[in-house]
């Protein structure tokens, strides 16, 4: 009694069909993500414009009680302007920049600071960590005139150094700029 049982070969999945379905699904999800990022960008912009005069979650609510509504619509429009740096929610997403750039929402100068292929600026960049330690634009403009004589020397001294700079060096640099503004000459203990 020989039983011949037909051995059925195991089902081989159609990997090409499965791959094409996954690629389509990925494209659909990418489109959905782009639309969500655009909506967040638009809602955030309208929120920042509407709440600029009185306060918002980004700048705080200090002006809510002190600011009274002006009847002058021209002043109202001028006060509704806000900085791109205040777009906290849009900038918190890695994919937001690509989605909003497709709309033309973020100016080109905002994209220049980004590393190619990264999508966002690194959270560990010195610019983000020491933003409060950096002098304001007015301070640097005033100090630039006094520092023009020192710039060639500074460039020569730092050109042989490594590309990595420490927090302490930046702190001393800011102190040096402040001394230049106040005293118009650097203190001996800060120059290196």
UniProtKB/Swiss-Prot annotation:
Bias (Acidic residues): 135-144
Q: Where is the composition biased (Basic and acidic residues)?
A: 177-192
What ranges does the record list as Polar residues composition bias?
A: 119-134
Spell out the Basic residues composition-biased ranges.
164-176
Domain of life, source organism: Eukaryota
> Where would one find coiled-coil regions in this protein?
11-45
Which segments carry the region annotation Disordered?
106-192
Provide the primary localization. Answer: nucleus
Gene Ontology process terms (BP): chromatin remodeling
Keywords of this entry? Activator, Centromere, Chromatin regulator, Chromosome, Coiled coil, Kinetochore, Nucleus, Transcription, Transcription regulation
What are the annotated GO cellular component locations?
kinetochore; MOZ/MORF histone acetyltransferase complex; NuA4 histone acetyltransferase complex; nucleolus
**Where in or outside the cell is it found?**
Nucleus, Nucleolus; Chromosome, Centromere, Kinetochore
Q: Which family does it belong to?
A: Belongs to the EAF6 family.
PANTHER family of this UniProt entry?
CHROMATIN MODIFICATION-RELATED PROTEIN MEAF6 (PTHR13476)
What's this chain's function?
Component of the NuA4 histone acetyltransferase complex which is involved in transcriptional activation of select genes principally by acetylation of nucleosomal histone H4 and H2A. This modification may both alter nucleosome - DNA interactions and promote interaction of the modified histones with other proteins which positively regulate transcription. Component of HBO1 complexes, which specifically mediate acetylation of histone H3 at 'Lys-14' (H3K14ac), and have reduced activity toward histone H4. Component of the MOZ/MORF complex which has a histone H3 acetyltransferase activity.
**Description of how the protein assembles with itself and partners:** Component of the NuA4 histone acetyltransferase complex. Component of the hbo1 complex. Component of the moz/morf complex.
What name does UniProt use for this protein? Chromatin modification-related protein MEAF6
What organism does this protein naturally occur in?
A: Danio rerio
Gene encoding this chain?
meaf6
């Amino acid at each position: 009694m020989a039983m011949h049982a037909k051995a059925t070969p195991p089902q081989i999945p159609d990997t090409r069909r499965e791959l094409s379905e996954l690629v389509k699904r990925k494209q659909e999800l990418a489109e959905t993500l782009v639309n969500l990022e655009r909506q967040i960008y638009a809602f955030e912009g309208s929120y920042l414009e509407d709440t600029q005069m009185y306060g918002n979650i980004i700048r705080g609510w200090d002006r809510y009680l002190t600011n009274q509504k002006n009847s002058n619509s021209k002043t109202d429009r001028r006060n509704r302007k806000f900085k791109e740096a205040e777009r906290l929610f849009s900038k918190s997403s890695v994919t937001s920049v690509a989605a909003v750039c497709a709309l033309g929402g973020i100016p080109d100068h905002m994209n220049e600071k980004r590393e190619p292929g990264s999508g966002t600026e690194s959270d560990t960049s010195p610019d983000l960590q020491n933003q409060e330690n950096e002098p304001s634009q007015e301070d640097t403009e005033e100090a630039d005139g006094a520092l023009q004589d020192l710039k060639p020397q500074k460039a020569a001294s730092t050109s042989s150094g490594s590309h990595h700079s420490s927090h302490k060096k930046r702190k001393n640099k800011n102190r040096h700029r402040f001394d230049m503004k106040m005293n118009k000459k650097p203190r001996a203990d800060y120059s290196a």
